[in-house]
Amino acid sequence: MKNIKAIIFDAYGTLFDVNSAAEKCKDKIGDKWEGFANYWRTTQLEYTWLRSLMKRHKDFWQVTEDSLDKSMKAYKIDSSMRNELLDLYKILSPFKEVPEVLKSLKEKDFKLAILSNGTPALLNELVTVSYTHLTLPTNSRV
């Protein structure tokens, strides 16, 4: 462990709770919010993989929008909630233990970074809200 100088994390589903956008709207979505959130995430991953296999790359935000549209239709969520859900996705909540873990690692002088399929703009917004001590990649494509 002495030779480890940096720790790299995935953002979505590791540092940030991808279900938190839907959870913040559970009063409007109702009891189906968790199923909806899980379906949205599953669809998002499926779209990413399929488009990659088909060599039809779309950036992560476009995939997020497309998967939200399909999920809203499947769960009969009012289309007026689309922009609210997308805005909340830009500022996903971190998992509750993450701030303390990152703080502890930073205090031990580890360099902390994110490696993600998220766009730099999305990652910058997430980190600006929650974790200014994380290093983000400067390249827009992985």
Question: Where are the model-predicted features located?
Answer:
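Short, glycine/serine-rich, charged loops/turns that create anion-binding
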Residues: 119, 141
